[in-house]
From Swiss-Prot:
PANTHER family: N-ACETYL-GAMMA-GLUTAMYL-PHOSPHATE REDUCTASE, CHLOROPLASTIC-RELATED, N-ACETYL-GAMMA-GLUTAMYL-PHOSPHATE REDUCTASE, CHLOROPLASTIC-RELATED-RELATED
Described function: Catalyzes the NADPH-dependent reduction of N-acetyl-5-glutamyl phosphate to yield N-acetyl-L-glutamate 5-semialdehyde.
Gene that specifies this protein: argC
Compartments reported by the entry: Cytoplasm
Family of the protein in this entry: Belongs to the NAGSA dehydrogenase family. Type 1 subfamily.
EC number(s) per entry: 1.2.1.38
GO biological process terms on file: L-arginine biosynthetic process
UniProt cross-references to InterPro entries, sorted A to Z: AGPR_AS, AGPR_type-1, NAD(P)-bd_dom_sf, NAGSA_dehydrogenase, Semialdehyde_DH_NAD-bd
Protein name as it appears in the record: N-acetyl-gamma-glutamyl-phosphate reductase
Length: 347
């Protein structure tokens, strides 16, 4: 049986990264996976070669308009659409179609949080696409609807969830994530112009205003016996892609560096895409570039009485498209790691 895949929002950064990964997927090489409709609103009528010269295999494919009719007849549909648009399309697709949404529309469980941060009516919650979270891999196997996590919540959750679950820390965390400009998407923006970003760092959506704040709190709260307070600060850096996250929290009394390291090594021992670095090594965005990996380091600041966890991911791969393909693999029964690079690009 051949699985036919469509990508809505194919000309965006996330859509292009999904295409790159699918073209390297063993199921594509064997004919078990076929790439069908490629759609987008603003670039409909253009060829993929005009928009994405790094994907010559599909250069002649014409981008179609994003409609439910165009996406009909596919087994899997990836949605790389702006927040709010995904729900509109998803609700028109049949229950037998596997829909994997890279937007935020179905991530949050709390309707009030959705309405506060996104300003529209909450459309519900789908199985959440971080397989490394306790219980999530099982929920994703065979799932027909999947909410791909946000890029910042991915880095923050993988950094902190072992410590929260093991009760190493107080439920009050501070997260700072430095991100590349591709996280802002392809839409023209003065704030993302090279002349505005090169040689400069800038915090934005501070003091709890960023939309990913409730998502991080939701994830950590799943493994905590009480709500987790999250202070989240994103920082824009002059990088095309990558997220470096540093997370701190007060330690519970008596927790040692050895205990913390043992918790992380055990938690991620069987995880293909999370690597706990040796003592003294630090995560680097370059080391995970183009891969589906998350590199993690855990340390104890004894003077401050805090844990310090650092993580690095590629925001377009493990932070979006890689997670989407990982979830597709689980949903349709492929090997979970199929088509997903475990080695970064260096230098």
């Amino acid at each position: 049986m051949t699985i036919k895949v469509a990508i809505a929002g194919a000309s965006g950064y996330a859509g292009g990264e999904i295409l790159r990964l699918l073209l390297g997927h063993p199921a594509y090489a064997s004919g078990e996976l076929e790439i069908g409709a490629l759609t987008a609103a603003s670039t409909a009528g253009s060829t993929l070669g005009e928009l994405m010269p790094h994907i010559p295999q599909l250069a002649d494919r014409v981008i179609q308009d994003t409609t439910a009719e165009t996406l009909a007849g596919h087994d899997v549909v990836f949605l790389g659409l702006p927040h709010g648009f995904s729900a509109e399309i998803a609700l028109q697709l049949g229950p037998d179609v596997t829909v994997i949404d890279c937007a935020a529309d179905f991530r949050l469980q709390n309707a009030a949080d959705w309405e506060k941060f996104y300003g529209s009516e909450h459309q519900g919650t789908w199985p959440y696409g971080i397989p490394e979270m306790p219980g999530h891999r099982e929920a994703l196997r065979g799932a027909k609807r999947v909410a791909v996590p946000g890029c910042f919540p991915t880095g923050a959750t993988l950094a902190l969830i072992p410590a929260v679950q093991a009760g190493l820390i107080e439920p009050d965390v501070s997260v700072v994530s430095i991100t590349g400009v591709s996280g802002g998407g392809k839409k023209a923006s003065v704030a993302l112009l090279g002349s505005e970003t090169m040689g400069s760092l800038k915090a934005y959506n501070t003091s709890g205003k960023h939309r990913h704040t409730p998502e991080i709190a939701q994830n950590l709260g799943e493994v905590s016996d009480k709500p987790v307070k999250v202070s989240f600060t994103p920082v824009l850096a002059p990088l095309p892609r990558g997220i470096l996250t540093t997370a701190t929290a007060p330690l519970k009394e008596g927790v040692t560096a050895e205990q913390a390291r043992a918790v992380y090594e055990e938690f991620y021992a069987q995880e293909t895409f999370v690597h706990v670095l040796p003592e003294g090594a630090q995560p680097q965005t370059q080391a995970v570039l183009g891969s589906n990996m998350c590199h993690v380091q855990v340390e104890i600041d004894e003077e401050a009485g805090k844990v310090l966890v650092t993580s690095a991911i590629d925001n377009l791969t493990k932070g979006t498209a890689g997670a989407a393909v990982q979830c597709m693999n689980l949903s349709v029964g492929f090997d979970e790691a199929a088509g997903l690079p475990q080695v970064g690009v260096a230098p």
